[in-house]
Amino acid sequence: MLESDRLISSQSIVSEDAMDRAIRPLSLSEYVGQDSVSSQMQIFINAARKRNDPLDHVLIFGPPGLGKTTLANIIAHEMGVNIRQTSGPVIERAGDIAAILTNLQQNDVLFIDEIHRLSPVIEEILYPAMEDYKLDIMIGEGPAARSIKLELPPFTLIGATTRAGLLTSPLRDRFGIVQRLEYYSVDSLTKIVARSAHLLGVPTKPEGAREIALRSRGTPRIANRLLRRVRDYSEVKGNGIITVDMAQQALEMLEVDQHGFDLMDRKLLLAVIEHFNGGPVGIDSIAAAIGEEKGTIEDVLEPFLIQQGFLMRTPRGRIATSKAYQHFGFSAIEQE
């Protein structure tokens, strides 16, 4: 099973890109949540515009689905400049990054998603471009190879990554502004769901929006996906208005519970509790018990359960916490 196969996946899905762009906020005033990031960026942007300078290079990191691409687009919009978007794996050759950089206009934004996946060769080209707005590339091969130096217009590089630890120190040190995006509160997600519902023309009661937010794992991308599925359900099974009852019925049908767990999350936790007395249990035993690959458990299922305090990863194996027992209605005696 892939992460992108799950309804509550925080990974981007190509078929949703167009709709996500339609509901994406364009200004910091519309950017709900991440209050510290918003207030800091507002000051940095206003200062850069006053000086008519490009904004310092920005690194945005955090879990997937929290709005790194959205924030990059907002920064460009607030600066009143164009944005060029690409991703680390796409830039394979020196000519690729050279073509992108030489087509930028003054103070434009270059947004590189998954920047931790840039090759060392591309990073080496970026260093002088970021520091001195100069491009130094080799043309040709062997004895005929020659170095060409080009002046670049001042620009802002915005890098986004879910794995900041994989960035090399020389690249990380060249970002003047570093922002971490955190998981969203239920209140912030409720506002996001209500705003998206309004833009999509979906009548939604405040309690209905909150019910969706509660099950969205702190992630706007998941909240917007669940909103679209609840909308479908309410149009077929109800009168098209998303109430709290309609949201609960739809999400129960979709097997997303009040903690945002899906069937596989619950299957894993129940296996640890019922088959292995709460653990500790090795990953191979869990994989055999639930019929899932070891890599999928480690990379897809476990992270959120651990982050929410339902599962512990120890040297002896996985252990279900008291929260996991309470979630399934097991008593303290049964837990022992």
Curated annotation (Swiss-Prot):
Residues 185-255 are annotated as: Small ATPAse domain (RuvB-S). GO terms for cellular component: cytoplasm; Holliday junction resolvase complex. The keyword ATP-binding applies. One of its GO terms (molecular function) is four-way junction DNA binding. InterPro entries: AAA+_ATPase (IPR003593), AAA_lid_4 (IPR041445), DNA_helicase_Holl-junc_RuvB (IPR004605), P-loop_NTPase (IPR027417), RuvB-like_N (IPR008824), RuvB_C (IPR008823), WH-like_DNA-bd_sf (IPR036388), WH_DNA-bd_sf (IPR036390). Homohexamer. Forms an RuvA(8)-RuvB(12)-Holliday junction (HJ) complex. HJ DNA is sandwiched between 2 RuvA tetramers; dsDNA enters through RuvA and exits via RuvB. An RuvB hexamer assembles on each DNA strand where it exits the tetramer. Each RuvB hexamer is contacted by two RuvA subunits (via domain III) on 2 adjacent RuvB subunits; this complex drives branch migration. In the full resolvosome a probable DNA-RuvA(4)-RuvB(12)-RuvC(2) complex forms which resolves the HJ. This is Holliday junction branch migration complex subunit RuvB.
